[in-house]
Amino acid sequence: RRVSWRYFADVLAIEIDDIPEEKRSAISAALRFKAPFFWKIPIIRSVLPLMNSSKPLCLLFASAFFFTAVCNGEEKIHDIVIYGDSSGAAVAAISAKRDGRSVIWLNPTSFPGGMSSSGLGATDFLGRRNTFGGIASEFYDAIAAAYGEKYVRSFEPKVGLQVFKKMIAVAGVEVVYNELLDRTPGKGVKMNGKKIESITMLSGKTYRAKMFIDASYVGDLMAAAGVTYTVGREPENQYNEDMAGVRRGDTKPRLHYTQKDKDHFIKQVDPYITPGKPESGLLPKIYKIENLTNGQGDKKIQAYNYRVCLTTDPNLHIPIVKPEGYNELDHELLLRNFEAGDLRMPALIEPLSGTGSKVDWNNMHAVGSDLAGGNWDYPEASYEKRREIEKAHETYIRGFLWTLSSNPRVPEAIRKQASKYGLSKDEFTDNGGWPWMIYIREARRMVSDYVMTQHDCEGKRSAPDPVGLGSFGMDSHCVQHFVTESGHAQNEGVIWRVPPKPYGISYRSIIPKKGECENLFSPICFSASHVAHGSMRMEPVFMTLSESAVIAAGLAMDKNTSVQDVDYEALKKKLLDAKQILQNQPLAQ
């Protein structure tokens, strides 16, 4: 027979009115898992007569059973389960808790805040601080306050971590760290029709909710739920984007790139192991591709790196040493580029707020800290393979830093400058000063009913249902080093063009298309082309879209609708109440 709270009352001889209304669905949920087995236990069957004759004993026994189910995690149905490692995941959890929702945050990492706590100290929003509000604005205000300032753009990783920890604690967010989704097909996500009913982790724990938010940088939950997504670059003709697909660095004028020769080779560099001898093979991570033409699509993504926090403070300085597994051949392209006459420091060194000794060391110019081509498998890779890719990046970047500071083939001025820097003892203290997280600039991208494209970024199309703003340049780091027809190394995939003004990001770009999963949001791996994603992939945007997702989830629950059927006008009102910014505003004087 159907197990329900009425069945619970009938078997235990409890008057239905004695069961509070708010407890009935919870009891029903617990029994749905426990009842068939529970009533077959001999000791339980033997005490039933006593229970029928004693209502207090009955209620006591029922309560014990009920709380056993709760403690086993089999009864609890949260309003919202958030899965993710990003700054957006933290903001979503805070937002849900403030909204009075029962929420649990399942964090695949051991720390909160994503890249905003793991080295991305130089926040990319082009000074357009007026393009986001809500909890994202609170976070950056708290960062500034930590330095005794009204406004800062860059900050130390440890300060980002401290601010997120405090905001999470004040909100009372329940976080489970190091909780990884079981990605075994058919095991990690249990669907009930078009809704996720529960998700199961590698720990064996299962979590149930009415709404789920995938706030991960890679979109594992979104993919496991059967939502349409893509990886790589669309061809130019798919969305009629003149920056899409392959973009050769030797194409001039570079209409897809407005920063002259930055991030490109400016000298002729031989790509072969033995210079001038193609038969010797290519240097590591250089590719010879026949008929490589601008506008072609592929499955490749822009390069990753670690955003290392370096310092010149002798009291904090951890020396850069030659890493285990170092191979000079991995850095031969860098060395030959110097020897060919490119004397630019191959790094974007951005000072961080604080004592003035720390910097956010990022990739720049022809060969830098990006390991182009080393990450193409990352989005779909197993957890084990991802760890291998991360380790390869760490070895490469440690080797790159050591080469800059120690190799005599590096120009003296650059070697002297690089040798001043070391990792910082007071950052990532449990990891030797090395960032916890690799910088995942791009992974999976959902394909929904509204795909954000270059046309949205450039104001040629405007989403009628904005839930946040984007403003950063359409930006892709190098995708690959390739051999030109003349036999020299060049970069491919680098794009940059700044939108004329901030633009709206569609609500439909953070939810699956109609007909797919009805209780899932994807505010990090959102629906966007490679070109548009390059502009939208900024930490303040991730935070903004994640808060908007939570607010929309609340509406969907309150109205008992799918995420696709949320009324936008009602959502817009709630977003504005939460101080989200939905349209371009003049800068404050």
Task: Give the residues covered by each predicted segment.
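Conserved N-terminal/central alpha/beta ligand/cofactor-binding core
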Residues: 95-102, 107-190, 230, 238-240
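Beta1/beta-strand and adjacent pyrophosphate-binding region of the FAD-binding site
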Residues: 76-86
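Conserved beta-strand-loop-beta-strand element in the redox core of flavoprotein oxidoreductases
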Residues: 187-206
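Boundary at the C-terminal end of the N-terminal hydrophobic targeting segment
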Residues: 71-75
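Bacterial N-terminal signal peptides
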Residues: 58-68
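Flavin (FAD/FMN)-binding glycine-rich loop and adjacent Rossmann-like elements that form
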Residues: 205-211, 215-589
